[in-house]
């Protein structure tokens, strides 16, 4: 819905609104990355959150900031936007990227100020801002690429995932959708990495045919997603 609202604003020349909406989409992508880090680097994230939040730590994990007692992507919105980026140091974010991310937040705040001194009325200027967002999110996703590929490889090698006799869903596409895409909130970026995984390196492993079938199903699912854009 937010993506559609942004597109509508852009097509109607409402670049200021489109810019604000794109920033929200950008932060949502950041929150999903952080949620993945909470799963993949759980102990480090717990420690980082404790030091970052201090006396607000328990509140962060409280009922009002979780769903069914679990963190979800929106939980991270409870942390100030400039502060939440610090959690990316867990996967090697450098100070240059942190500075660029904080700059995006500062610019958004400047454009959102009620005095209206800064107005984004040019399509060219709007597209320049979007390129800045996209450049930064590409750098953020690059930080987790290795982790995602490791996750995919270990998942493919898990009998509970690949074995058709015991896995949750017999249909390979449904198994991919439910047990990896939804479970780990994988984006198109990450699915694209996974579909390029060299499945032949598992050729000598047990039940290779089932693993290959699931890998093909993931590639098919990715192509269907891409065709819908």
Each PLM stretch: what is its role?
Residues 1-82, 147-165, 212-213, 220-229:
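Amphipathic alpha-helical interface elements
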Residues 82-155, 159:
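Charge-enriched, short contiguous segments at helix-coil
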């Amino acid at each position: 819905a937010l993506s559609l609202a942004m597109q509508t604003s852009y097509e109607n020349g409402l670049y200021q609104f489109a810019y604000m909406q794109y920033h929200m989409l950008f932060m949502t992508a950041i929150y999903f990355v952080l949620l993945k880090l909470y799963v993949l680097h759980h102990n480090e994230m717990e420690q980082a959150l404790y030091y970052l939040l201090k006396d607000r730590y328990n509140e962060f994990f409280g009922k009002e900031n979780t769903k069914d007692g679990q963190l979800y992507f929106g939980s991270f919105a409870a942390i100030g936007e400039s502060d939440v980026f610090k959690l990316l140091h867990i996967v090697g974010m450098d100070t240059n990227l942190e500075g660029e991310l904080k700059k995006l937040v500062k610019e958004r705040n400047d454009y959102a100020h009620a005095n209206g001194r800064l107005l984004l009325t040019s399509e060219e200027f709007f597209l320049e801002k979007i390129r800045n967002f996209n450049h930064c999110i590409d750098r953020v996703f690059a930080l987790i690429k290795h982790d995602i590929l490791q996750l995919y490889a270990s998942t493919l090698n898990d009998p509970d995932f690949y074995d058709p006799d015991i896995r949750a869903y017999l249909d390979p596409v449904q198994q991919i959708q439910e047990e990896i895409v939804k479970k780990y909130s994988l984006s198109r970026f990450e699915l694209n990495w996974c579909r390029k995984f060299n499945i032949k390196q598992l050729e000598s492993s047990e039940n290779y045919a089932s693993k290959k079938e699931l890998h093909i199903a993931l590639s098919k699912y990715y192509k269907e997603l891409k065709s819908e854009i």
